[in-house]
């Protein structure tokens, strides 16, 4: 398989997964609305749109998804690490009793998805295609630091106010 075929198959595979996850997220959102359950997600329509673009071989979409996958992974891990320090544990336990399981489970499932997506889009055939198209390919250090930095900044503001 040539590099062109390899990068297109990687983009298609990642696109299919994002499309499926986006459609499932939209389905969960509709279910929660119909049942009056609280549910917040802004992942759904973007996952569908970027999934379709990736399936069509868009290197722009690959670059965007690569960046935001690393950002979401870092900020998600950072949030899990800092969350116990943001409010008393008794308040957290009281809130857990009244939230939908979707509110906890789906964000936790997005962490491994973000890891897998960033890893797939950071493979050599994709990076080579991005470079060949003239797009700058930077290491994922910046989105990772940005994700951790955002969580640290918000956590600092919440903790000291």
Region spans (language model):
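Topology signature of small-to-medium multi-pass alpha-helical membrane proteins
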Residues: 1-161
